[in-house]
Each structure stands twice: as structure tokens, then as C-alpha cells.
């Protein structure tokens, strides 16, 4: 369960949507991602997430909704099979686990500076924090692989599959060799109200500052 929560925290970043400025057939995966980062400042959508161990064992699938607003604001709400909420207000990242009655608080730079969140929610150049390479097309998507330059990032690589200038699937291999796949759907670009990224810990919960 602890490892599942860590994966969910790492992937709270994967709320995405994009509007194409050029046809997808003319753009590489890198160009499509660059277009997404440059043109989509906010979006909402849904996700489904599954995790497989190096031995092939599967963890319970997760599903929920997300929202983001650049730079660095996002909301990742797991609804099934248990509730979990991860919210960044651009300065701090709050992870709330209702069943544990606990809120974990991290500074946003600490939480997403060199994580996959920086790819989709940040505003910097991808090549500054990641070594990026192209992958063969697969499952109707164009793919790229990003490997963190920081050895302490907590994951070894993240593959991003794109279609029509929209990230559609993310596959992350973490430090334990687990592969977490996130499927994105119902992507709706547009400004998201600031209230979506405000979080106040409920009374009675433990608040742990990292």
C-alpha cells in the first residue's frame, strides 16, 4: 500500500491536455510535447492508473480526476479504490490520505522540481532536467523517453505517448523497478479557478512537513 501511494504521489503530475497548432502527422513526440507545454496553460480531465511489479504482480487499479494550471499548480484526486488527494498551490504540495488521517506537506520545488511533474506542469525546458530520446511508435501513439539527470529523482525513466499534440499515456519506471501506467481521458484545456488548488487540512488530522 505504501508503494502504491508513492507511485500515486509521483504521478499526481500527469493531468494534461493540448490543442494542436500543427497536424500530429507532421510533428515528432518531442514537438508535440513542446506544443503542449507552450500552449496549454491549464486543463482538467480524468485518469486511470495501474502498477506492475518487476515480477509481474499487479496493484489495485486507481481512477480519478485531475486539474492543473501552469506553473506548478495541480490537483490529482484518486477516487477509487480508496480516496487520496494531492494538491499543489504553486508553493506547497499537500498529500491527503483520509484513511490514514494524515496530510504530508512539501515545498513545490522539492516535490516536483526534477519529477515527472516538471514535464507537464512546469514552464522550463525539458532538456535542463531530463535526457530525452525518441522511441518507436506504439499503440497508435508517438513516444519519447525522459531520463532524469538527477540520480536522486526516485525514478529511472518516464515514457510519454502522444497523439494529436495531446499526452495520452505515461509509463513510469520507479526506483523499485515498478512500472506505473497512466491513461488520460476527457481532456479539456482552459483556465482552472484558483480555488481548485487551495487546500486546508481537515481538523484532527496529522500534518507532517517534509
UniProtKB/Swiss-Prot annotation:
Keyword ATP-binding annotated: no
One Pfam family, short name: LolA
InterPro entries found in the cross-reference section: LolA/LolB/LppX, OM_lipoprot_carrier_LolA-like, OM_lipoprot_carrier_LolA_Pbac
Record's subcellular location: Periplasm
Keyword Chaperone: yes
Single GO cellular component term: outer membrane-bounded periplasmic space
SUPFAM superfamilies registered for this protein in UniProt: Prokaryotic lipoproteins and lipoprotein localization factors
UniProt signal peptide: 1-26
UniProt keyword list: Chaperone, Periplasm, Protein transport, Signal, Transport
UniProt similarity note: Belongs to the LolA family.
Function: Participates in the translocation of lipoproteins from the inner membrane to the outer membrane. Only forms a complex with a lipoprotein if the residue after the N-terminal Cys is not an aspartate (The Asp acts as a targeting signal to indicate that the lipoprotein should stay in the inner membrane).
Quaternary structure (record): Monomer.
UniProt protein name: Outer-membrane lipoprotein carrier protein
Originating species: Bordetella bronchiseptica (strain ATCC BAA-588 / NCTC 13252 / RB50)
Gene: lolA
Amino acid at each position: 500500500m505504501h508503494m502504491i501511494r508513492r507511485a500515486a504521489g509521483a504521478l499526481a503530475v500527469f493531468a494534461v491536455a493540448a490543442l494542436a497548432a500543427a497536424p500530429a502527422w507532421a510533428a515528432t513526440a518531442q514537438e508535440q510535447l513542446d506544443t503542449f507545454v507552450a500552449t496549454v496553460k491549464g486543463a482538467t480531465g480524468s485518469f486511470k492508473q495501474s502498477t506492475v511489479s518487476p515480477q509481474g504482480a499487479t496493484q489495485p487499479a486507481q481512477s480519478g480526476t485531475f486539474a492543473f494550471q501552469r506553473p506548478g499548480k495541480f490537483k490529482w484526486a484518486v477516487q477509487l479504490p480508496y480516496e487520496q488527494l494531492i494538491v499543489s498551490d504553486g508553493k506547497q504540495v499537500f498529500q491527503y490520505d483520509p484513511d490514514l488521517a494524515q496530510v504530508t506537506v512539501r515545498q513545490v520545488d522539492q516535490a516536483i522540481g526534477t519529477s515527472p511533474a516538471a514535464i507537464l506542469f512546469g514552464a522550463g525546458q525539458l532538456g535542463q532536467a531530463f535526457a530525452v530520446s525518441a522511441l518507436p511508435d506504439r499503440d497508435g501513439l508517438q513516444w519519447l523517453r525522459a531520463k532524469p539527470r538527477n540520480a536522486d529523482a526516485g525514478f529511472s525513466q518516464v515514457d510519454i505517448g502522444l497523439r494529436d499534440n495531446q499526452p495520452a499515456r505515461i509509463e513510469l519506471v520507479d526506483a523499485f523497478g515498478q512500472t506505473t501506467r497512466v491513461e488520460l481521458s476527457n481532456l479539456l484545456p482552459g483556465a482552472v479557478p484558483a480555488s481548485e488548488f487551495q487546500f486546508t487540512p481537515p481538523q484532527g488530522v496529522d500534518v507532517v512537513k517534509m
